[in-house]
Amino acid sequence: RPEESSYQADMHLYMKILRCNACHERQPLTPPRSDIRAHFSSSGEDLGDEGRVPPALNGVGRKLTRGALKKTIQGAMPVRPYMNTRMPNWGDTHADILTEHFIESDLETDEKPTPRKGRENQVGRNMWGRALMGIDGLGCIQCHPLNGNRSLGIQAMDLKHSSGRLRAPWFRDYLMDPAKFRPGTRMPSFWPNGNPSLKGHGGSSERQIDSIWAYLNELGQSRLPLGMESKGDFMLKPERRPMVFRTFMKDAGLHAIAVGFFRNFHVA
């Protein structure tokens, strides 16, 4: 294993003193014990471990903005209302020290800006992002609430928090390969091997992800995605063409894919 930097060594010592690893995983520290993990619970249905176990802290200094990271350590930025375990408030001093150590340990110096400044012909567009979020796109709203509006399926994390919490380069890399950052996640990859699974809406993976980021940054002044504006009682009705709905079904499995046809014949 490569030798730890002074920031990493100090941070890991600090985490041990505060016992952060009693609830959070952060390599190379000892992860939470199984008997402790058994006490974590969730009020959300069908969210699995992601809904009950506090998130890992691997790379968190690259994931969260400085302000969001400090607020999180202070317990002042709860974004997982379904998680029954709550983050304590460690106060300003501990929060400042840990925030600095996380950022110095994790943040990369050669990050690409997103959207990419000076390359306006390749950056995202709000309208593409809105389309990708909806049921005729990638269907993000099937699992994620948006600005307080309920999702069509399970109630995972509200994406309204994304632009204020996350660093854009981390967001881009996470969407490309969610399982790399969170092994066992139910979040699918819509850009396998860097290639878009859906044509249009900017065309390239780079443009599509930038478009989603642009939409989330302008969420307060944008229309809701198709399927959420007038979702009614969450009934999805295929009309012109079959509709694909990724969800978690009791009899079909955790990564079920339901396909609805306009003649009331459906498969999963």
Which residues are covered by each model-predicted region?
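Long, helix-rich interaction regions
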Residues: 93, 120, 124, 135, ...
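Beta-strand-rich N-terminal accessory domains
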Residues: 229-268
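Axial heme c-ligation environment in periplasmic c-type cytochrome domains
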Residues: 1-3, 33-62, 74-105, 112-119, ...
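Electrostatic cytochrome c docking/interface patches
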Residues: 1-16, 30, 108-135, 224-228
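The canonical Cys-X-X-Cys-His
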Residues: 1, 17-28, 69, 87-88, ...
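Repeat-solenoid scaffold signature
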Residues: 2-21, 26, 152-161, 211, ...
